[in-house]
Amino acid sequence: MTTPVRTLVLLRHAKSEYPDGVADHERPLAPRGIREAALAGDWIRANVGKVDAVLCSTATRTRETLARTGIESDIRYEDSLYDSRPGIVVDLVNGVDEDVTTLLVVGHEPTTSSLAFALADPSSDADALMRMTQKYPTSAIAVLTTQLPWAQLELGGATLVDFHVPR
């Protein structure tokens, strides 16, 4: 029996506002972020397909980003995705059910780009890597594939196949 190709989609939250007196964790999306989160959802549906499960930070801006994408799936909100590190995210991914073939992670910088780079193996798309190196802006999407079961995914264990910035 062959292991199915699994797809990991890493979405940085959309552009947020900086209202006075609002804690960082509670910052909402800016109007531009609302628009771009919807564009991100459209792009994911058109280019990746159905998302089976989502891991999302508990921060207001990530929750609002996910809601505005219009992606309906099994969602798990994780406090540890806020102010996180790549290893923490990999640990969360390692715990995802093996029936999930496409997983979306909605998170923050610098973790999202660091994770994408750390997971990318030598066969990754050079153009996508170059664009990611230049900047991983709000609403940016990295798409990686792997033949490893989620429980075995480790750094260098996936191929970066696309990088998109919805505008």
Tell where the protein language model's regions lie, with residue ranges:
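Glycine-rich phosphate-binding loop signature in dinucleotide/nucleotide-binding domains
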Residues: 47-50, 95-100
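Domain-level recognition of soluble alpha/beta enzyme cores
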Residues: 120-159
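Short, solvent-exposed aromatic-acidic interface loops
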Residues: 158-167
